[in-house]
Structure formats: C-alpha cells, structure tokens
C-alpha cells in the first residue's frame, strides 16, 4: 500500500509535465537544456524573493490576519513575471515555443523543490493521507498557472501589441500575480476545507487560463 500510494502520487504529479513536454513539441526542438536553464533562473528568483521577504516582511505572529502585510508579500510575485520574461528573452523561436520552455522549466523546478521531498517522505508513510493526492493535483494547477503567466508576459512584451489589447493583458497579469493572495484570503474568511480550497483554485485558474487563451488567439490572429 505504501509504494502503491507513492506511485499514484508521483504519477499524478509528474506525468502531466512529461506529457506536456512530449505533446507540445519541445522534445523535437531539443529544448531540454533550455528548460533546465529556466529552472535555474527559477531558483535564483526564489532566492531573491526569500531574501527580500525575510528582510522587509518578517513572519507575522499576531492572531489577526494581516491583510496589508499579506498583500505586500504577494506583490513580490511580480519577480516571477520578470524571471519568465528573462527566460523568454534568451530563447529564439516562435512565441509558443518561448512560452512553453519558460513555463515548463519554471513549473518543473517548483515541483522538484517544493513537492518532491514531501511526496517521497510523506506518501511512503504507513498511513494513507489525502493531502499528498491534493499536493499532486495542485502541482498540475501550478503548471497551468505558469503557462498562463508566460503567455501574458509574452503578449505584454510584444513591441507591436495593439494598444486596445494592453489593458486586458495588464488586468490578467494583475490577477495572475495576486491570485494566490485572493484565494488565501477567501479560504481564510470562508474557512474552506482543503478539498474546497483546491477546487476553488482549480476553477479560478481555469477561468484565468481560458481568458488568457482567448486573448492570446486574438493577438496572434491580429498580428498574423
């Protein structure tokens, strides 16, 4: 049961990344090392974020939810967009190629750094726990989130982007940056359970992805 549970969690967390890499055509471009470079950039950006948060936003120890403090902490996630832009600017090729390399490398690095050890240690335990299934599902949501964020960064950095599209792209980028903060606040205020919180995050991410996809198609069609 222990190895079976770990195998299920591992497959649920990692196989969608492998399938995305194969089905997106990145394997045909030999983009593996480009994804590795994106992962290294992720590590550097997260280190800078941790140093910044530890310096200017120490851990809140009060009993009341610090709304302003959490909002300011969430603003640091803008660094992720800057990092994604840096990765895409260093890769030559079509827009969809840049987006997938940056997003897949970024999301895979986050998966390895934040979920690999908990799955290896926890999912191999004697007792079954749903939280590791939830963690695996959440990793898939994160992959979609970073694909969406990369597409938004790619659109906003186009020098020939029509001014009519710019407000919509900026709004979607704002929602992407503060999505985690809004969801955390919503879960805290409504006292949602773990499954309800996961479902809410999946729905919000899905809506954001559909909106970004529609805008991306419009931008590509206009400039084609």
Swiss-Prot record:
It is a multi-pass membrane protein. One of its GO terms (molecular function) is ribosome binding. Pfam families: DUF2053. Component of the back of Sec61 (BOS) complex, composed of NCLN/Nicalin, NOMO (NOMO1, NOMO2 or NOMO3) and TMEM147. The BOS complex is part of the multi-pass translocon (MPT) complex, composed of three subcomplexes, the GEL complex (composed of RAB5IF/OPTI and TMCO1), the BOS complex (composed of NCLN/Nicalin, NOMO and TMEM147) and the PAT complex (composed of WDR83OS/Asterix and CCDC47). The MPT complex associates with the SEC61 complex. Interacts with CHRM3, CHRM1 and AVPR2. Interacts with LBR; promoting LBR localization to the nucleus inner membrane. Interacts with DHCR7. This is BOS complex subunit TMEM147. The lineage of its organism: Eukaryota, Metazoa, Chordata, Craniata, Vertebrata. Changing residue 7 to R: In NEDFLPH; decreased stability. Changing residue 133 to N: In NEDFLPH; decreased stability. Its main location: endoplasmic reticulum. It is found in: Endoplasmic reticulum membrane; Nucleus membrane; Cell membrane. Component of the multi-pass translocon (MPT) complex that mediates insertion of multi-pass membrane proteins into the lipid bilayer of membranes. The MPT complex takes over after the SEC61 complex: following membrane insertion of the first few transmembrane segments of proteins by the SEC61 complex, the MPT complex occludes the lateral gate of the SEC61 complex to promote insertion of subsequent transmembrane regions. Also acts as a negative regulator of CHRM3 function, most likely by interfering with its trafficking to the cell membrane. GO terms for biological process: multi-pass transmembrane protein insertion into ER membrane; protein localization to nuclear inner membrane. InterPro entries: TMEM147. It is linked to Neurodevelopmental disorder with facial dysmorphism, absent language, and pseudo-Pelger-Huet anomaly: An autosomal recessive disorder with onset in infancy and characterized by global developmental delay, intellectual disability, dysmorphic facial features, coarse facies, and behavioral problems. Affected individuals may have variable findings on brain imaging, such as cortical atrophy, thin corpus callosum and enlarged ventricles. Laboratory studies show nuclear lobulation defects in a subset of neutrophils, indicating a pseudo-Pelger-Huet anomaly. Belongs to the TMEM147 family. Residues 22-34, 89-98, 156-164, 217-224 are cytoplasmic. The gene is TMEM147.
């Amino acid at each position: 049961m222990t190895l079976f549970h770990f195998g299920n969690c591992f497959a649920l967390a990692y196989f969608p990344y492998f399938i995305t890499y194969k089905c997106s055509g990145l394997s045909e471009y030999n983009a593996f090392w480009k994804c590795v470079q994106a992962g290294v950039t992720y590590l550097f950006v997260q280190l800078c974020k941790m140093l910044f948060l530890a310096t200017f936003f120490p851990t809140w120890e009060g009993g009341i939810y610090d709304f302003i403090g959490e909002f300011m902490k969430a603003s640091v996630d803008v660094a992720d967009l800057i990092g994604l832009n840096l990765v895409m600017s260093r890769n030559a090729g079509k827009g969809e190629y840049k987006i997938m390399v940056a997003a897949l490398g970024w999301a895979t690095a986050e998966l390895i750094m934040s979920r690999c050890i908990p799955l290896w240690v926890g999912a191999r335990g004697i007792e079954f726990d749903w939280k590791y299934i939830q963690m695996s599902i959440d990793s898939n949501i994160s992959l979609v989130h970073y694909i969406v964020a990369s597409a938004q960064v790619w659109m906003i950095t186009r020098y020939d982007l029509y001014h009519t599209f710019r407000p919509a792209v900026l709004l979607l980028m704002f929602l992407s940056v503060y999505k985690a903060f809004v969801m955390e606040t919503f879960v805290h205020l409504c006292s949602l359970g773990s499954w309800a919180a996961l479902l809410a995050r999946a729905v919000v991410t899905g809506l954001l992805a559909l909106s970004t996809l529609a805008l991306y198609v419009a931008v590509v069609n206009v400039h084609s």
